[in-house]
Structure formats: C-alpha cells, structure tokens
C-alpha cells in the first residue's frame, strides 16, 4: 500500500513503526506534509542564522521565536490547521529571503537555505508545488536508516526544547544560547558529512540543552506563579456557567482568570492543565473551581458533555467533533 504520509514522532504511532495513511492523533496526510515542509524551511532558515552568527551578525529575538514556534507547531496534538501551517511556511521563507542577503559566504549553505516558492514573476507557486516539495523533504528522504533515525531523534528533541522555550518566552524569559543551539542543531540534520558518531554526540548535546530548557521554563513559571505545592483539587462541577481550559500555557490561564473575575463564570482545567491548581498565584481566584474530565485522549466525549466554551492553549488537541467545534 502506498504511503500517504509518514510520521513516527509519537509513541502511539501505528504498529509502533509509523503512521502512513492517517495519524493515530487524527492528523491527515496533507497536514503531515505541510508540517514536514515547515520543518524543512525552518532548517533552511536555521542554516542561514547559524552562518550569520559565525560571521558575527546578531540574530533578532523575533527570528529566534519564529523558528521556535515553527517547531512547536509541528509537535503532536498542537495544530491541525493546514492554512495556519502554510502561512507559517510563507512567513519563514520571507524572513529567510531578507536574512540570506546579509550572509557574506553562502557557499556552505544547504539547498534548504535557497529553496523558494516564488516564481520568476514574483508570485507564489501553487499548493501542488508545496506538496511536491514536502514529499521530497519528509522523514523518508534520508535513505540510511541509522542516519535517518538519529536525525529524527535530534529533531524531536529540538521540538521538545522548542515547547519549553515557547512557554518560557510567553513569560518574557529567553536564553539566546538555547536559541543558537536549537538552530545550529536543526541545520546540522541537513549535513550529509556528519557520521552516525557525530549525530550521537549531537543527540546527547540536544539532551543537555533540553534539561537547560526545562530549567528556564521552571524558573519562568515559579517566578511568575510561585512554587507548586500539594493541593486538593475539586473534580466536581458547580451550577455557574463554566469555561474549560486545556494545555500548558499558564499565561493564557492567568489572562482568562483575570477576565472572568466578577462575571459569575467559573473556570475548570482539563487534562494537562491540572497542575495549574498547584501554583500559589492561582489560588487567589475564587472562580478557579476545579478540574473537569480525564486525559487528553478522552476529550471528544468529555468536551461534548461540557456545554461551555473550551480554551485550548497548547498541544493537547485532537481534531474536534462538529458537536462542539463552535465552542472551541
């Protein structure tokens, strides 16, 4: 059977070998293709930014955040909106066109640093061109299985690092050294001169930076909301109207709680937002009343039963049912 896609970035992948027709997470082949292409153009931009740093040129915070958010967009259960992903591809290419003009020596840059969707007359190529390139640039484009596995292991580690960084960035916490490493390592996955031993070393370095990224996020979270403490959480429901919040973005939760004060609207966490109850700063909100439901993978039935609005802050979403899509 012909592969419509190939994705094996999560532990629940089909047959423990890879989703090839549709993602177990609900991801469709066309979404998988555009995620692959977004990673590819992010690698190209990262090659440019890495070369700029070598030449002594500073890379802007906006560019760092763009690459970080691109990777975060492609992690499991984060974004199934193809139009939004394609928009990020266009934006990434636009930034790269500007930055590559600042590079003094482009001789060592990979093909991904030059690939573009602009035609000779300056217009954008059709979506068919995007999908054709995505097929060329996907996971299986690396033929050697060992090299492929190591490159993807590094990429998935960088995606995890991007998740930590993205959440820390929202709380105005940045580490330029993490950004520089993430981009250098991402660009290195295009370097055919690197051996398996080289990639193993880079994998270990990625792990070290992953720990550093977690520390940055922990410092950002505890600095803003205090140190988590043992807390009893209500798992029942009240009589007031309610809003359900899922994901990991504590800043989004804080903003919602501020906006709902005195309105008679209660706020409930779902799934991975449950730990928010442990932070002292959130205990001052009387309408932050408890947790509704269970794990993220039960959301289709639980969101259907919850009759209020649902706020998804980060990567916990599955393609929604029509019965509650308008409330999401």
Model-identified regions with their sequence ranges:
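Metallocofactor- and cofactor-centric catalytic cores in central/energy metabolism, strongly enriched
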Residues: 2-328
């Amino acid at each position: 059977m012909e592969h419509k896609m190939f994705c094996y970035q999560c532990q629940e992948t089909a047959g423990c070998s890879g989703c090839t027709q549709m993602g177990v997470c609900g991801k469709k082949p066309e979404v998988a293709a555009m995620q692959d292409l977004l990673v590819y153009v992010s690698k190209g931009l990262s090659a440019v930014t890495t070369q700029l740093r070598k030449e002594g040129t500073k890379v802007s915070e906006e560019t760092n955040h763009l690459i970080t958010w691109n990777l975060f967009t492609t992690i499991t259960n984060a974004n199934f909106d193809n139009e939004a992903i394609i928009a990020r591809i266009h934006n990434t290419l636009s930034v790269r066109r500007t930055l590559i003009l600042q590079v003094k020596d482009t001789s060592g840059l990979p093909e991904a640093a030059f690939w573009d969707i602009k035609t000779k007359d300056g217009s954008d190529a059709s979506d068919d061109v995007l999908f054709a390139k995505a097929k060329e640039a996907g996971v299986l484009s690396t033929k050697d299985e060992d090299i492929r596995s190591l490159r993807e292991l590094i990429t998935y580690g960088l995606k995890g690092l991007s998740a930590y960084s993205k959440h820390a960035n929202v709380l105005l916490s940045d580490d330029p050294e993490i950004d520089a490493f993430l981009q250098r390592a991402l660009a290195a996955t295009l370097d055919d001169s690197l051996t398996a031993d080289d990639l193993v070393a880079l994998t270990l370095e990625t792990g070290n930076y992953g720990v550093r990224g977690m520390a940055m996020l922990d410092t950002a979270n505890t600095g803003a909301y205090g140190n988590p403490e043992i807390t009893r959480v209500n798992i029942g429901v009240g009589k007031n109207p309610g809003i359900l919040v899922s994901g990991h973005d504590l800043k989004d939760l804080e903003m919602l709680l501020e906006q709902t004060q005195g309105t008679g609207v209660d706020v409930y966490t779902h799934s991975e937002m449950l730990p928010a109850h442990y932070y002292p700063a959130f205990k001052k909100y009387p309408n932050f009343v408890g947790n509704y439901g269970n794990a993220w993978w039960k959301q289709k039935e639980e969101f259907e039963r919850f009759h209020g609005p649902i706020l998804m802050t980060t990567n916990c979403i599955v393609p929604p049912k029509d019965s509650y899509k308008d409330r999401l």
